[in-house]
Amino acid sequence: MLKEFKEFALKGNMIDLAIGVIIGGAFGGLVNSIVNDILMPIIGFITGGIDFSNMFIQLAGEKQATLSAAKTAGATISYGNFITLLINFLIIAWVLFLFVKGMNKIRRKQEKEESSKKMSLEEQLLSEIRDLLAKKK
């Protein structure tokens, strides 16, 4: 059983998946930093200094100034956090779309090259006939 697991774990697809997960985790951190440290301050500046991290609706208790205080006081709806996560998602989805589009373009180009290299059935038969005729002479 250990041998079977080793064969499974060391297959190319499993290793590729592990590498993808690691790169995805690092990419997620990078996107979070871009959104939180670059885009959200710019959006806040454009919208007149709105801080999305403290946008919330307090459902219970006294009105609080910050999200953390409001969560301590009672139930809250943190729609500012949702806006930030939505922007994160859109950036990741866009980058993945561009990556997949590029990979598909490369794959189509390779398939086209491979199909042009393969001879059709008629071409193969004509080549065989030519070779046979050349041997008879």
Swiss-Prot record:
<dbReference type="InterPro" id="IPR036019">
    <property type="entry name" value="MscL_channel"/>
</dbReference>
<dbReference type="InterPro" id="IPR001185">
    <property type="entry name" value="MS_channel"/>
</dbReference>
<comment type="subunit">
    <text>Homopentamer.</text>
</comment>
<feature type="transmembrane region" description="Helical">
    <location>
        <begin position="80"/>
        <end position="100"/>
    </location>
</feature>
<keyword id="KW-0472">Membrane</keyword>
<keyword id="KW-0407">Ion channel</keyword>
<keyword id="KW-1003">Cell membrane</keyword>
<feature type="transmembrane region" description="Helical">
    <location>
        <begin position="38"/>
        <end position="58"/>
    </location>
</feature>
<comment type="similarity">
    <text>Belongs to the MscL family.</text>
</comment>
<comment type="function">
    <text>Channel that opens in response to stretch forces in the membrane lipid bilayer. May participate in the regulation of osmotic pressure changes within the cell.</text>
</comment>
<keyword id="KW-0997">Cell inner membrane</keyword>
<dbReference type="Pfam" id="PF01741">
    <property type="entry name" value="MscL"/>
</dbReference>
<dbReference type="InterPro" id="IPR019823">
    <property type="entry name" value="Mechanosensitive_channel_CS"/>
</dbReference>
<protein>
    <recommendedName>
        <fullName>Large-conductance mechanosensitive channel</fullName>
    </recommendedName>
</protein>
<keyword id="KW-1133">Transmembrane helix</keyword>
<keyword id="KW-0813">Transport</keyword>
<keyword id="KW-0406">Ion transport</keyword>
<keyword id="KW-0812">Transmembrane</keyword>
<feature type="transmembrane region" description="Helical">
    <location>
        <begin position="15"/>
        <end position="35"/>
    </location>
</feature>
<dbReference type="InterPro" id="IPR037673">
    <property type="entry name" value="MSC/AndL"/>
</dbReference>
<dbReference type="GO" id="GO:0008381">
    <property type="term" value="F:mechanosensitive monoatomic ion channel activity"/>
</dbReference>
<dbReference type="GO" id="GO:0005886">
    <property type="term" value="C:plasma membrane"/>
</dbReference>
